[in-house]
Amino acid sequence: ASCAARACALSGSNITVTYCSCTDGTTHVCPDGDSHETNDMYFCENISGVAACPDTNTVAVEVIYRDDSTNPIEGFQLHCRCSTYESSGLHYVCEELIG
């Protein structure tokens, strides 16, 4: 299987690590940290969407929606990655996008 389509992106940084199982967007395949440790969260990144973002500090990622701690994945939503993420209700969002 190719790793070209997706990779795991570490929030709060420009680090992107290859993670082949990100090709399955229906399951929780990226590693993650504690729900309160949002700076350590990993997100499944759509590499093809990176070029649509204005610069290297805003990378397109699919935000992982969480319904609860035992069944964390409710869906994905594409955003441009900013500098930091934080918890907002049932999902993680870029701090700069909270308004």
UniProtKB/Swiss-Prot annotation:
Keyword Secreted: yes
Entry keyword annotation includes Secreted: yes
Localization: Secreted
GO CC annotations on file: extracellular region
Record keywords, A-Z: Disulfide bond, Ion channel impairing toxin, Neurotoxin, Secreted, Toxin
PTM (free text): Contains 5 disulfide bonds.
GO function term, MF aspect, one: toxin activity
Tissue: Expressed by the venom duct.
Main location per the UniProt record: secreted
Domain statement: The cysteine framework is VIII (C-C-C-C-C-C-C-C-C-C).
Function: Acts as a neurotoxin by inhibiting an ion channel.
Stated name of the protein: Turripeptide OL71
Organism whose genome encodes this protein: Iotyrris olangoensis (Sea snail)
